[in-house]
Amino acid sequence: MSLSPHVENASIPKGSTPIPKNRNVSSIGKGEFLGSSSSNNSSFRMNHYSNSGQPSVLDSIRRPNLTPTFSYSNGVYMPESHRTSSFNDSYLPYDKNPYAKTTGSMSNKSNMKIKTKKNAINTNTRKSSGLIYTTKVDKELSSIDKVNDPNINGLVCAGKTHLGLYKFSPSDRSIKCVHDFITPNSNTSTRGTTSLLPKLSKRTRQNKFSTIADVKTGFNNYKNCIAVCNNSTAISIYDLNKSSSIDNPLITSLCEHTRSINSFDFNMVESNLIISGGQDSCVKIWDLRSNKSKSSNRSDISINTASDSIRDVKWMPGYNFASKNDQGSSTYGNLKSGYKFASIHDSGYLLKFDLRQPAQYEKKLNAHTGPGLCLNWHPNQEYIATGGRDGKCCLWFVGDNANAAENTVLNYGNSPSLHAPNTSLNNSGSLAFPKLTINTGYPVTKLKFKPAYSSNIYNSLLGISSMGDEAEVRIYSLARKYIPKHVLLSETPSLGLVWWDENLIFNIDKGTRINGWDINKEPTVLENLSKNTTTWRDLDGNGLLSVDQEIGSYEVVEPELQPTSSTTCKKHPGTIKNPKNGNPENQGIIGGIKKGFSHTGLTSFTPERPPTLKAGPTFSSKSLTLASGASSFNSSSASLTSLTPQTENREEIAIEPPCIITLDIPQIFNNIRLTKIAHSRKKNVISESSSMKNSPVEKFKYLARQLKFSYIREHNVSDSADTAYKNDIENIDVVKNATETHGDNTTTTNNNDDGDDDDDDDDDDDKIIESHLLKKYNFPENNTWATLMNEKVNNKKSKRNSSSSREFDEKDVRSSISSISASRQSHDRSRKIDKNVEAELQEKIQTLVDLISIATHNASVYLSIDDLTNFKIWILIRDSLLWDLKWMTSSQISSDNASNMDANESSDFEAGENLKTGKEFPEEDGAGTSGAESLVEERPQAFRANSDEPSDAEKKPVSKLKEQLKNTEIIPYAQPNEDSDEVLTKLKELQNQRLESRTKMGETVSDDVIIEEDEHEHQEEEQPHDSPTKSAQFHASPIAKSIPILQKREHRKSFIDTFMLHSPNGYNGDTDIGNEDDNISPRFTYNSVSPRSKVSSLQSYATTTSQLETFKKLSSHTAPIIGSPRHAPSRPDSIGREQLSSSLTKKLAKCKKIIADPPWDTKKLIKQLYNQATETGNVVLTVNILFLFQTIYQITEIDIAKDAIAHFLLLLHRYELFGIAADVLKYCPFEDIMGSEGDQSSIRLFCERCGELITNESSKEKLRAEAQQTGNKKIMDKFGYWYCDSCKKKNTSCVLCERPLKKLTMVILPCGHEGHFQCIQEWFLDENEQECPGGCPGVAFI
């Protein structure tokens, strides 16, 4: 038989080692491959060639060399000199070798000697000798399969316009095209002859196969059948024996799929069955015995997988592996090979089915993150290898859990854990992990297991063909997944592969070349790798890498088998012969299943797995259609042969990979440098912060990411007040740890208060930054929260003795706000606050706690970038909020404690004074400024005596503020005179009236605080609940309202005192007579009084002259009047300035008139900081203040706040901080933050008749002029957009009343008719109609 002119045969002498490397061969590049070639189970479509008979221009395009100089495929470095495992310049085909002799005939080319070039490679490198067959075809190839006839050394290759039968000869190592089923005249070389087929001429349109071509051959009785995609939705079956041009080789066509077919496969056991899957997500099973016609449009079994497109579908193989034992030869097979099949889908899911129960899949595994492209069953075990577009090849166990122990081995190196599968038989949605994952780096389009028996799954070989530019076929041993065992290089990228037997493997490439290798003659990759190599670990040169001299192997050591006498081996189901008589449709698996379908039977087809009732894939056949999970099977008519179980369990020992020793020299040097230079890390952090400071853009981005702009998020996250306090305490510890290391006089703290020590690097950096900046700028430590915490610890260490009989009993303040409320109610059950007021108070306290935590966090952020100005601003805001929080919690305790005073030892004057001065605010001086934690953890000092208390003369003033306020003269007003007698008389009367009214009304201490949404709406409601006790707290001494640091050493000048004394509304030394009157009130105390004293400042002078006694009386009578309900403010920072009645004296009026808000008033302070931020252009601080405090203190107008936040959002978008901008919008307290830019949209109306834009400007001007002339403004009501000035026609009228649609319009969606809202409402709702008023068919409204 002559050779086909379409095949270029390269005969190779026996014993030679030819390795083709034709770089000038005509081929197509990567781009043409994606557009013209096809690949089995691939995910892309390719265009057909043109219908003309001329050769494609793509065949003449030269493909560039795809072999790189250096290859890093799969993490293995291979220089080109070592990439000769399959390709070598010394072995080129004769027709392409420039050194070959040009004389001689074609018949003796195979016997000619080839002059080879000297190959300058390492002599230790083993050359390839495994390439046995190679030939080039001038037709495009896309799929390959072997002929399952042992008497024929045949291959079947398919392409768009080619379906050829090829035979290879082991004797002369040649491949020849025997027959082309598409162009049967290709075997004749006579020019001008035509096909012998009837009605076929030269101009007959050439047949083409599907764009997604796949080819498969049958088994056993159907080994002469070839299945191929004839078009996108049909499978054509050809007969190999009908190779003559007279016979028509087409047997039948299977065309039930509605979309393209991607894969099909013959059953190895029941060879008459063929399965197919396609884009329609359906699996079709065909019985070739029942499809004897030329075309069949209905399959025997149809399964809708209820998933997406099927990329590949395969039957479980049924190989017969013969072995010898004591009883003789035996055959190993698989019992379930005739019934199981699997499919892989676009979604990456792997589904396993049992033909006996097709209504429900057995397993569903999420195999790949992207589309799955191919799968292949293990020859004798229930494992499936899958390949996907994600570049991974995964091994999955799909058997029963009972057999899982057979396949476990010991782990080694970085191999995945070989755990037992966690899927059950009926668990369709179980989550499982692959037994093994091979990262190829390219989409895996084809993979095939070596058809050899393997008792250990990890001794199996797997051939992989990728879609990338790597022109090679890799063969992996599952025992060593990181380094392939063989790399078979081809000229162009591989398109498919097939194992002929255990040693011979064929592939086709993009260059239309068929290659065959003998892997026993191929060197392994480890043999060609250099043994003495030291190189950098990565491209950046970070570390060295060397390879151990022990190479290792690719196999797992297996112990010898221990055969048992009880092992009996039965014949494989593939050897079953159909009886000669009887209907073939009722024989075999299909017949057994169809016989087993019964409407009344309740038993399962097999007792091992009952039918499931889950909703799953739909199943249909010619005889019966089953609903999901609603059918049952009958096992009365199916006789199935069984196989012996597989080999018994054996213990396996995994091989150890080569030892890789790394030496990270830069890291070693870096560690040495860090040990020698202890402060280098601190310098690096400080240099980074300074570099950020020099870049305003980077600083803005950093602040936008790190700062907290809203307390709403923090409030929502907190489940209770305890969570908020816990977060606040953690923030306190960060600042505390940062300041512990600087200053010689800093008090040592106890780090075990919270029980948490954070050793992270980030916390260490914060400590370094904060310590450095505090020391650099000499920031006074008595203004930091850490010092307040130090004081709290020291106070806990000091001894506390019980007080006198007039003092209160010791009580612990619990660690939450709710416990404070419960303790207060237990003290005096008769005085209960309304539940609504209590809830409102708790909410406001929680808000304050959140704001304090945010202020602390923002201060630490500014400190980390060396921005001391903004750092002090946030510290100032935090301390001001602490004062408000302290007053709210302390007022509750003090009001209850005041009721426990002994009436016999305390007069009305003393009770008021003790509550206002000595009993509450000295406690606040001691611990009130130590943050939220001190409010709920520390015991109030006002309720205890201190034996170690120093004398009054030894105590020093806390701040300069108290010294300046002490300079006022009070003696003239303390001396008794006529005016003072009159004042005392009036004050005494008012006090008695106040006390009587208070007793009658049962007043309690008001819980109102400074945080109010609407101050004026709630002021009248809160006034009846005010008491002199609260007013006294408002006018306590300035020392009580400041934030002093109590330590037994001389304090430096406080930053808060310095800043506040220069406030425009603050105090100075120039006071007049009126201010002196003001100083008489309990607002001030003497500097010689200890803040920890249990006795008020006035009581400490009880034994002095009568002048002081008179002053005490004056103070006691003045306080109730100032704190009367009539003048009680609803906020502690806003005191009424209304004029007193004419009955009071002039000096009493002055005493009330000049009372001003304290300089640390929170609202005043935040407004000043806001104005300063706007004047200096501090955008971040401005927006931060508006976010946190606008809704609480009304910093500015609401429109200005919205505009500022909207511009801040635009700034975030400009610097691509979209996530932060989204959070700003999410937690913004204003809904319409974007204003006209975010809520309004321009809608253009076009005329439905002429298509012009409806503006109606001309009619608008006419109506406006007419309205001006007549003075009738109702004329403008005629204007609208319900008509068009261009075409002078009206738009659609109402479907019911047929009047113009001028106002609100409703549209009926099913038909599109429009109508007035009133008309549609009357038609559908009032009249209960369901059809359209226009008479459109169907229900329009339900």
UniProtKB/Swiss-Prot annotation:
Subcellular location per the Swiss-Prot or TrEMBL entry: Vacuole
Domain of life: Eukaryota
Biased composition (Basic and acidic residues): 952-963, 1016-1028
InterPro entries named among the record's database cross-references: WD40/YVTN_repeat-like_dom_sf, WD40_repeat_CS, WD40_repeat_dom_sf, WD40_rpt, WDR24, WDR59_RTC1-like_RING_Znf, Znf_RING, Znf_RING/FYVE/PHD
Biased segments, Low complexity type: 630-644, 815-824
Residues with PTM Phosphoserine: S1037, S1081, S1088, S1090, S1124, S1134
The UniProt record lists the keyword Zinc-finger: yes
A cellular component annotation (GO) from this entry: GATOR2 complex
Keyword Transport: no
Region (Disordered): 1-39, 559-593, 600-619, 630-651, 736-766, 788-831, 942-963, 1014-1047
Repeat region (WD), residues: 207-248, 256-296, 305-342, 367-406, 439-486, 489-527, 844-884, 1130-1170, 1217-1256
GO molecular function: zinc ion binding
Pfam family, one: zf-RING_16
Ranges annotated as RING-type zinc finger: 1294-1336
Chief localisation class: other
Ranges of Acidic residues composition bias in the record: 753-766
Protein family per UniProt: Belongs to the WD repeat RTC1 family.
Function, as annotated: May be involved in a process influencing telomere capping.
Protein name: Restriction of telomere capping protein 1
Species: Saccharomyces cerevisiae (strain JAY291) (Baker's yeast)
